[in-house]
Amino acid sequence: MKRLLALAMTTLLLISMLSGCGSTEQPAADENGVYNVAIIQLVTHDALDAATQGFQDALIAELGEGNVTFDLQNAAGDTNTCATIVNSFVSNNVDLIMANATPALQAAAAATADIPILGTSVTEYGVAMGIENFSGTVGGNVSGTSDLAPLDKQAEMVKQWFPDAKKVGLLYCSAEPNSQYQVDTIKTMLENLGYTCTLYAFADTNDMSAVTQEAADNSDVIYVPTDNTVASGTGIIDGICQAAGVPIIAGEEGICAGCGVATLSISYYDLGVATGKMAAKILKGEADISTMPVEYAAVSTPKYNAAICEALGLTAPEGYTAIG
């Protein structure tokens, strides 16, 4: 009888252990009641910086000053560095990882299936995570916020500003899958509005100038999506396109400030705030990340770059706010 009881207890223990395998760890504050939150940001530019700041501000507001510490690391645009950074986060057993931009999210998801991961500044989670027929919830230990702009309204913006244009160049970095998603989507929308569209893809900053020049030489107007490589190289793009007299409609405000004439942009700071509020719910045990749907920005604002508009002789339509 004792042997049978021992066998039964062993079996129950094994079942309990196996049932816990692959589950997301419940975050727990350290002995001082402080949560350790790690942040990996792909690269430095205005949009990502704003999202990171919003995330930190919101999490401090939700948890209280002194109840959360941040380990903020920047990968300087290098995907290999992303992997190194997130592996160190996993080794340190942080309570939660915030991954700012798609390559950062992909690296974090590859590094751990246990620590909760929230993405932000990620355009399309189905594309980023390789999920076909994405339903809005990633599942497992991943969720976050999306910076997907209203592409249909941005296409209409091209028509509003440049109704007589014929050729639209779509300029983007081919190494960013979310940029590919955006240009493929808006291309169809623009073609339905009567434009002839051509994709101009550069691999990285090494061929950005040559591809931008080709786009400027063959386009009446250029559209650039929310693209981290573009955001880091707006000075190069602006120098070429202004000299050619070719205007740019940009996917977000930071890019527009650097090289565009107009944008319909979300607030990346507000996006970070929304991500921070999600993080607080997870850390406090109020939400299960595996069931949390990806959240989207609710508001987008039409803005214009007064300096570039003046240089190109353009006047903003009513309803646009000057950047900065």
Predicted regions and their residues:
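Short, low-complexity disordered leader/linker segments with a strong preference
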Residues: 1-36, 61, 65
